[in-house]
């Protein structure tokens, strides 16, 4: 049977088990435990221990929700990917459009699909932060400011996907040099690193 720190399987596919990976526990992509090496730790001679930046969760196990809710959350993720791609290309106007689409999609997520108070509370706390960061991106006039807010959006969407799951494979990626060398995470549909925090300057960092 599955333990809390093991992989999460949903309808034959798995969601990224970010908490397990980043805390060095066993996961689908890290069967034996221990820190997951992202390939960026020694980039440009810099050594950055991913354990210095952790994503905290109230629970390490995923909360069971309906497939309908997961599908609605997936539309938010898809809008996020378009926003991420716009940031990679440093297209400020497209970033604004994508952030507005993300806000539209998240407003359509039906909270009535969450059956108990704990699940509802978890979602409400995350959606508040997601909306706050995304709204800030939609109002930002330059790419640097957009990327700053994207960091917070990413952290909270990672948490949401970890807790509730979506029926697709998702990768959590990390750049140790972003956020003034404090590092920053983002989500991707592919394992290949394409950096939204630096664009052409360090595209594969």
Regions found by a protein language model. Give the residues of each.
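Intrinsically disordered, low-complexity terminal tails/loops enriched in metal-binding residues
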Residues: 1-205
């Amino acid at each position: 049977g599955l333990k809390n720190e093991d992989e999460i399987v949903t309808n034959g596919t798995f969601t990224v088990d970010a908490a397990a990976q980043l805390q060095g526990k066993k996961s689908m992509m890290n069967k034996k435990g221990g820190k997951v090496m992202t390939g960026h730790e020694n980039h440009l001679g810099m050594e950055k221990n991913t354990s210095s930046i952790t994503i905290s969760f109230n629970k390490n196990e995923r909360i069971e929700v309906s497939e309908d809710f997961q599908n609605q959350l997936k539309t938010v993720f898809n809008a996020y990917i378009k926003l991420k791609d716009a940031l990679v290309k440093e297209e400020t106007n497209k970033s604004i459009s994508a952030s507005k689409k993300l806000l539209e999609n998240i407003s359509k997520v039906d909270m009535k699909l969450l059956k108990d108070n704990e699940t509802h509370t978890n979602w409400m706390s995350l959606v508040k932060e997601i909306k706050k960061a995304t709204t800030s991106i939609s109002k930002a006039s330059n790419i640097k400011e957009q990327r700053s807010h994207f960091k917070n959006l990413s952290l909270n969407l990672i948490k949401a996907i970890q807790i509730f799951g979506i029926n697709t494979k998702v990768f959590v990626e990390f750049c140790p040099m972003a956020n003034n060398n404090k590092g920053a995470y983002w989500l991707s549909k592919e394992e290949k690193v394409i950096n939204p925090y630096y664009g052409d300057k360090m595209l594969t960092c």
